[in-house]
Amino acid sequence: MINVFRAMLVAALLACPFVCVPLAANDDAVTPMQGIPPTRESQVTMANYRDYPMSMWAFRNASAVLNTVMIPREGDIRPLPGPLRPEIGERRFTDPQGRELSFDALFQANYADGVLVMQGSRLLHEAYFHEFNERSHHIWFSMTKSLASTVFGLLVAEGKVDLDASPVKYIPELKGSGFERVTIQQVLDHASAINFKENYTDLQSDFALYYAPALNMGWLPGAADVQPADAEVYGVQDFLVQFIQPDPALNPGEAFDYNSSNADLLGWLIARISGEPLQDYIQRNVWAKLGPEHDAYIAVDRALVPVATGGMNTTLRDAARFGMMIRDRGEFGGQQVIPAQWIDASLEVSDKVAANMAANPKYGEEPWTAYHNMWWILDADKGEYCAVGIHGQVIYINRSADTVMAWFSSQPGASAARNPEFRAKLQAARELAVSLTRKL
């Protein structure tokens, strides 16, 4: 059966390569989902939903493309009072391409779908582009990792987790896997020294043949259709048990190697230790306490288990509410949602963690100074850090400026920091935060 599956998947890949090919942003681009029924050239599918311009429709309608489960809101809506400051959208910035643009024009030119600026409890600015609006949901992708780490902190504070223990202590099924020799803290820092690599070009890799179909988020076209019910690997947790092995060239804690399977494991730990499905744990402990305007939802893998590595979907305002809670050390609306000690821990960067980032050649020209507890650190002393997702999703937090900015994007390139469109938006946000600091 596995050989049949391999043949079917490789045939599908050869027929429709899964590597995203960026398209230029121009008026000639196909408008997604045009016509009743949609024309074939404008049809969004699991095979093309991450390709621009199809992504402009798909990222705000992810529940139409992916399997999802609901994370319901409850209680009163926490208002985001103004007044709005129109001059923020008109402020001029120079992007990395040398173009002088207004704040809003810069974000729109760099494939943003929406951007929002908060200082304190005040909503200073929000702008939406294309067909996106304040009621639209948008997929977070890997910003979800930071959310998972945040709720994990509750279990740590309750004494239910030992960060220096192996994950095997809580998930015995992982005994003999690459995760047996690591600590949970090393998993949180992507320093687990496992041999699994997210290889998007080797069609015979474990990633292509097993992980991507199990994840069921369209990383490989046709994956939802070609995976047989009796496959060796059905869901992501099956993959973690069967395929993750230690990297013989590395010891845990020696290197920063960003790897989505670490967040998959974190989601499993949360569910196993709490005794609740991940979506229920998030809803009860975080989402219900943020006064969101809308329900959230999260993509699930083939086994219908929430994708902790990249499945969250919310509106932009509700993403900002989460960012405000993080900025304010876990407090929101007069209640302590997450222990302040855990929120602060993400900014307590050891010399070793910082050195691991500096030593990784992938990030040599990037602004990040560290990656810790599944957050991207810019300046720990200023409390400046981010949740980041592929295709340009960001929650930017700056404690010293009392500022949170959030933006969603459909930028063609998947990689975030190594993308000029991503850099342009992050640079403008950081410059704006500095100017807002001067007015405090």
Roles of regions detected by a PLM:
Residues 18-132, 161, 189, 193, ...:
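N-terminal leader/targeting segments and the immediately adjacent pre-domain N-terminus
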Residues 26-42, 384-440:
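Structured C-terminal helix/loop/strand segments within mature extracytoplasmic catalytic/sensor domains
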Residues 106-116, 129-160, 164-178, 182, ...:
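Short active-site loop at a secondary-structure junction
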Residues 121, 139-163, 187, 266-270, ...:
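Active-site SXXK
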Residues 128, 134-135, 199-202, 209-303:
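Catalytic-site signature segments of enzymes, centered on catalytic residues
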Residues 139, 143, 157-202, 245, ...:
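Active-site helix/loop module of the DD-peptidase/beta-lactamase fold
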Residues 190, 262-269, 310-331, 393-410:
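Active-site-proximal alpha-helical segments within enzyme catalytic domains
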Residues 293-296, 347-404:
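Active-site Gly/Thr loop motif
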